């Protein structure tokens, strides 16, 4: 089997045929974890044996055991390797997202297990995207997302959560990568912290004529502001992305709580930034989990 991540289209039939056993899934995960060969984290020796019944590697020098999933978001999970692989494939290959109820039915696990799997996958998406910063031309703005609230005197209701959004784009206005962050407020210092974490210094930031944005980003970015008008073609990529994000949250997940909103934003950003990969997204997600 090729040592590369999957490059061509992989159908459900292809996936079933390629990963029809624990051994094949184990081989796939090991290639992801050790693309240049195993190296013991304890003694540095490159030879090991396998304890397949427990998905462990045993160093032939120091005899220490290393779990295939150690250091990953699935560490200490009781899932089989096939379940992990199926979960990644099903989650990655539905561009609308996948709810815990859907995954529960497809994997034939209980709801709590399905929910745990999706939380782990979203965490892997977040960790992978934290490696990268937006640069070049970046559209920046904020939005409000309705989130469910519980425990109020009148029962369940909704409140608006503040979200800062930034979308990088090319010179011909094609959007590339995106960042979204739930924010406690929309003050200048908050925009400044968001930019420091997510936007490379020296980038050209395009936004509306918001005083907090001007003050928060004035020192380290080339700024371009316009007073917002619905007739103008300004921040179109960003507003389209916001609309798509809200459609995913309402359509697939039927709303989320404020406590978990960031997890769903992380999922959306990972998908959006890799939307051109199509079914190759499975390989990208697997790499995010195991690399």
Predicted regions mapped to residue ranges:
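Residue-level recognition of single "structural anchor" positions
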Residues: 1-291
């Amino acid at each position: 089997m090729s040592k590369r991540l999957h490059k061509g289209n992989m159908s459900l039939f292809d996936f079933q045929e390629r990963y029809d056993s624990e051994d094949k899934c184990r081989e796939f995960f090991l290639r992801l974890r050790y693309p240049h060969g195993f190296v013991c984290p304890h003694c540095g020796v490159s030879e090991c044996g396998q304890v397949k019944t427990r998905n462990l590697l045993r160093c032939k020098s120091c005899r220490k055991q290393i779990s295939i999933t150690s250091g990953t978001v699935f560490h200490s999970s009781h899932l089989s390797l096939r379940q992990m692989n199926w979960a990644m494939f099903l989650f990655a290959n539905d561009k609308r997202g996948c709810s815990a109820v859907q995954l529960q039915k497809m994997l034939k696990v209980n709801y709590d297990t399905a929910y745990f799997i999706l939380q782990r996958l979203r965490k892997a998406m977040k960790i992978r995207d934290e490696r990268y910063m937006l640069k070049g031309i970046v559209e920046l703005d904020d939005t409000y997302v309705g989130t469910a609230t519980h425990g109020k005197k009148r029962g369940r209701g909704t409140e608006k959560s503040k979200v800062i959004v930034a979308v990088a784009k090319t010179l011909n206005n094609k959007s590339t990568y995106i960042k979204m962050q739930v924010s406690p407020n929309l003050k200048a210092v908050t925009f400044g912290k968001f930019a420091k974490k997510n936007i490379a210094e020296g980038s050209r930031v395009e936004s509306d004529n918001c005083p907090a944005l001007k003050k928060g980003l004035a020192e380290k970015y080339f700024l371009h502001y316009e007073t917002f008008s619905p007739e103008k073609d300004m921040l179109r990529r960003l507003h389209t992305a916001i609309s798509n994000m809200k459609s995913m949250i309402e359509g697939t997940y039927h709303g989320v709580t404020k406590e978990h909103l960031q997890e769903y934003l992380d999922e959306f950003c990972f998908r959006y930034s890799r939307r051109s990969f199509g079914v190759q997204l499975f390989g990208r997600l697997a790499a995010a989990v195991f690399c």
